[in-house]
Amino acid sequence: MDYEFLRDITGVVKVRMSMGHEVVGHWFNEEVKENLALLDEVEDAARTLKGSERSWQRAGHEYTLWMDGEEVMVRANQLEFAGDEMEEGMNYYDEESLSLCGVEDFLQVVAAYRNFVQQK
């Protein structure tokens, strides 16, 4: 899972992720927005879940983060729709709406993001 952190001309941090993990970048850009307290909450949840059968979820405005002791799922909230809403022959492109990754990989991105934000 490759990632890149950038600052736009206003100084706001933007995250770009590799193909297949774009939604993780969108989660940082839309939900975190340099809110380190949210990252604290996610890291605390990961520590609590490690070695357990439980799961944790944080629904945001645009994206929901779900995790258990082994993996993290980020999905767009708009992804919930009935299958019969699609026209016949059409497929829903969800590469940028759903992503799964390991907890350790995700926490590495969280730590790198935190370090980048604090370098102002």
UniProtKB/Swiss-Prot annotation:
What's a Pfam family in this record? UPF0231
Source domain of life is Bacteria
Record InterPro entries: UPF0231 (IPR008249)
Q: Which family does it belong to?
A: Belongs to the UPF0231 family.
Report the source organism: Escherichia coli O6:H1 (strain CFT073 / ATCC 700928 / UPEC)
Q: HAMAP family recorded for this chain?
A: UPF0231
Which segment of the chain is annotated as a signal peptide?
none
Protein's UniProt name: UPF0231 protein YacL
Query: Lineage in the entry?
Result: Bacteria, Pseudomonadati, Pseudomonadota, Gammaproteobacteria, Enterobacterales
